[in-house]
Amino acid sequence: MKTKNILFALIGILMIAALLVGCSGGGEEPAAEQPAGGEEASAPAEKPYIPVISKGFQHQFWQAVKTGAEQAAADYDVTITFEGPESEAMVDKQVEMFQTALDKNPAAICLAAVDSKAFEPLLQEAKEKGIPVIGFDSGVDSDVPVTTAATDNIAAAALAADKMAELIGGSGEVAIISHDQTSRTGIDRVKGFKDRIEEKYPDITIVDIQYGGGDQLKSTDLAKAIIQAHPDLKGFFGANEGSAIGVLNAVTELGMEGKIVVIGYDSGQQQMDAIRAGTEAGAITQNPIGIGYKCVEAAYKAYKGEELPPTIDTGFYWYDKDNIDDPEIQAVLYK
């Protein structure tokens, strides 16, 4: 037994000695290869990330904006995400999206706000973090955004009012269905149309203005109620795609085609078909692909520290059955 204990002790001493030799290595292990200058090799640089937060995605207009944003992302080699709430009335949902994007510390953020006043605290947070914010389509009541890529909606709606006055003979009752009274687009389009009528056409009366949230069914019901309440109505202005389609549905369902002049805003297959058929007199089209492209382009330039103008005017056009197939118009229409 004594001999066995001595043997175990010797084995233990030999194992400890082997471990000590292994730790010292008996010499230096070759160092990991490093680039010249002794600095560690860096991982490939990630592309700048720019979240694009839209007012929605349910209308073809927003899909066209997304197409433009994706084109700019490819041209400027940046990564984007494109999202928006299910409804253009969901302010809280969009605010949550902006907060989530901000928490990811992006290179810049593009925002089309559903409420021009709701984002001020988050905009200030973005400013403090040094994250540029670019407005698109619908701006905010704040000086934080570096620039806003959008249509001059007041001027565009004023043109719609001029066309309405011409088509109804300069007198009569008209009405407006708009998408909201909180976003800059909703506010400015109603203002542009209303102000032009009041300034230039004293014999035209705007008998009602209603807001359907851009929802076609709700806008249809509102338009039908207005038509029934005002049997002498001569004209209707739908201030975005959903509003215009709602007006068209109401006019058709009540058998008022040819009796009420319908002027819309934006495009989409249903409006284009109605214009070709004569149910809709014409519409204002924006340049949605251009809006999407310009907002991402501006975001990249702001991230790089380039100077930008306060606004980027993306343009607008009047189209009707006479020019709908012109190449210039076809380039800015979407289906």
Where are these predicted regions, by residue range?
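A residue-level marker of the well-folded mature domains of exported/periplasmic proteins
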Residues: A9, G22-K335
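Bacterial N-terminal signal peptides that target proteins for export
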Residues: M1-I11
